[in-house]
């Protein structure tokens, strides 16, 4: 689990451990995340933009999940570097499956029109969204044996407090109908969707909405 210390990463680690998986939680500074070790994960330091680090940490694993983020670096540079290093490192480690936590602003509202393309889309969110868009292009253009999938939650703020319901919808590259409806989608249920796709893959080499 790369980016295990973030909001999505922490929930994914907890969900995977609860299901009986052995999980390696990769963060830049393990001392900041003792709760991950307390969950039962193997907490290690690593760098998702370094293919050698990825390969060494991923060896012996069946799958990888990336929920990495760096707010102190240009998003377009960081996400491209991470995508390239993850594909390279996981390929060398013979890890066949990678799930990536994307962003809902990449989903289409109509054919060829993404959320981030809409008039009035906030400038302060554009650079981060374009970073994820560049990441997706790296994945789509890669000649790789790694079977990747990018899951994009609704283009709204996810619920950090709500508990796990185990219920979600998934599929397609468009914003799910009523995705911003009465029941906010939670990080806990995003984690359920991620681990379900690790255990029972149903989508491959595409961007899909989840919510």
Language model segments and positions:
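NAD(P)-cofactor binding segment of oxidoreductase domains
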Residues: 66, 70-99, 130-134, 138
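A conserved pocket-lining segment of Rossmann-fold NAD(P)-dependent short-chain dehydrogenase/reductase
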Residues: 168-185
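Glycine/proline-rich active-site loop of Rossmann-fold NAD(P)-dependent oxidoreductases
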Residues: 144-145, 158-166, 197-206
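Substrate-positioning beta->alpha
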Residues: 131, 183-195
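Conserved beta-loop-beta element that borders a ligand/cofactor-binding pocket
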Residues: 137-159
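Conserved Rossmann-fold cofactor-binding substructure of NAD(P)-dependent oxidoreductases
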Residues: 39-62
